[in-house]
Amino acid sequence: MNNQDQSLIFEVSKEGRVGYSLPELDVPETDVTDVIDEAYIRDEPADLPEVSELDIMRHYTALSRRNHGVDSGFYPLGSCTMKYNPKINEKIARIPGFSAIHPLQDEATVQGALELLYDLSEHLEEITGMDEVTLQPAAGAHGEWTGLMMIRAFHEANGDHKRTKVIVPDSAHGTNPASATVAGFETVTVKSNDDGLVDLEDLKRVVDEETAALMLTNPNTLGLFEENILEMAEIVHSAGGKLYYDGANLNAVLSKARPGDMGFDVVHLNLHKTFTGPHGGGGPGSGPVGVKKELIPYLPKPVLVKKDGRYTFDHDRPHSIGRVKPYYGNFGINVRAYTYIRSMGPDGLKEVTENAVLNANYMMRKLAPYYDLPFDRHSKHEFVLSGRRQKKLGVRTLDIAKRLLDFGFHPPTIYFPLNVEECIMIEPTETESKETLDAFIDTMIQIAKEAEETPEVVQEAPHTTVVKRMDETKAARKPVLRYEK
């Protein structure tokens, strides 16, 4: 095995090798069957790797060097808001009063933690223009489902059982139609117009007495602000439907505009994105949901309330959709988000949006001469390019993404949204310096020139990574998901 190989930890195993040696037993030996029912005892030993501590350290350290995160490099993944997560968040989250408590403790012993949750809810209400917020949902899609279930409960409580359809734009996140389906709705697609915005005439066509809600991201997934949002709200509300805000792109409007003022009835947020809870690797996340007054009765229970200066959970909510998560949400991520909001303040959050939008537009204008710009207008926090020009030269958007790896950059989101051919979606966030943006811009320009002059360099990329291109078809059809001898 050379130093560039990366064996599985099972393949490093040597029979009889141990990581730790225990002292000689100095207490009476106990038969495991005396303390554990035989039904729960394995018939044979688990096939675990036998390795030393040094083997473990080198194995996982080597793997970590191959990983890419916000702390190691630029991560312009569109619609993901991969901003830097301030380390003060981690320090606060590790305070014993936050990290060493248990959700089953008596409320009287965790008043400080409950106060934080209550204050966080109030801050999020102010930021979004909602009347009340629940912190239970564990992530964005979970928040979507929670919000839709409240909308469903509202319609059913009003005897409006025919509202079975949720409208989503053709540029929507894939989680929107998925969440609607899981919540028991049928999805209806509304088209975008030539400007990349929701087509109002098509919206009027699809809205009817069966419409439960319209789900929107604003700005949308193309990075464009839905400038007709007030008219859209009127169209949906006049038909008896509700307007749902997907908070994936809230980073573009912090302290500048509020979903509640745009006419939205329900909002979900991604604290692990906009409010710097670390994300990636599957979690944990936090997807709070805010609602307007008439939907408050349907919030998940229990609801945190303040009575006589004390914080307590109110379980007496007869119209609630019930719990959506055990206990009270992902507390550690909520602590980090609260720390971020209090650290930044209203003016700081406004500056976040201003810099995020400035960075995106700066990059867009610098790259427009080299890549197709489907929507040549002011963008918000992210923007979309198209690799159509390069595709004519035999270089696909996938090739461009692979080539970026050679320069130490994580690729942007590609081939999404689906309504843009050879889509390249870039979100720089506010935390990146001009020097970093310029380095990425220069690299993208170099790749565009390579596509014209030496396309094979891009087509065969990456060249410097340990793992080159995988057989993606084989990986999809014959995945190897577990180790076998």
UniProtKB/Swiss-Prot annotation:
NCBIfam families, alphabetized: PRK04366.1 (NF003346)
UniProt GO MF annotations = glycine binding; glycine dehydrogenase (decarboxylating) activity; pyridoxal phosphate binding
**What domain of life does the UniProt record list for this protein's source?**
Bacteria
**Annotated InterPro entries:** GcvPB (IPR023012), GDC-P_C (IPR049316), GDC-P_N (IPR049315), GDC_P (IPR020581), PyrdxlP-dep_Trfase (IPR015424), PyrdxlP-dep_Trfase_major (IPR015421), PyrdxlP-dep_Trfase_small (IPR015422)
Q: Which organism is it from?
A: Bacillus licheniformis (strain ATCC 14580 / DSM 13 / JCM 2505 / CCUG 7422 / NBRC 12200 / NCIMB 9375 / NCTC 10341 / NRRL NRS-1264 / Gibson 46)
Reaction catalyzed: N(6)-[(R)-lipoyl]-L-lysyl-[glycine-cleavage complex H protein] + glycine + H(+) = N(6)-[(R)-S(8)-aminomethyldihydrolipoyl]-L-lysyl-[glycine-cleavage complex H protein] + CO2
The UniProt entry's GO biological process terms, in alphabetical order, are: glycine decarboxylation via glycine cleavage system
Q: What does this protein do?
A: The glycine cleavage system catalyzes the degradation of glycine. The P protein binds the alpha-amino group of glycine through its pyridoxal phosphate cofactor; CO(2) is released and the remaining methylamine moiety is then transferred to the lipoamide cofactor of the H protein.
- Assembly mode: The glycine cleavage system is composed of four proteins: P, T, L and H. In this organism, the P 'protein' is a heterodimer of two subunits.
Q: In this record, what's one Pfam family?
A: GcvP2_C
Q: Does the keyword Oxidoreductase apply?
A: yes
Q: What is this protein called?
A: Probable glycine dehydrogenase (decarboxylating) subunit 2
- The record lists its disulfide bonds as none
Q: What is its EC number?
A: 1.4.4.2
Enzyme kind, highest EC tier: oxidoreductase
Family assignment?
Belongs to the GcvP family. C-terminal subunit subfamily.
Cofactor(s) this protein cannot do without? pyridoxal 5'-phosphate
Alphabetized UniProt keyword annotations: Oxidoreductase, Pyridoxal phosphate
Q: Name positions with the PTM N6-(pyridoxal phosphate)lysine.
A: 273
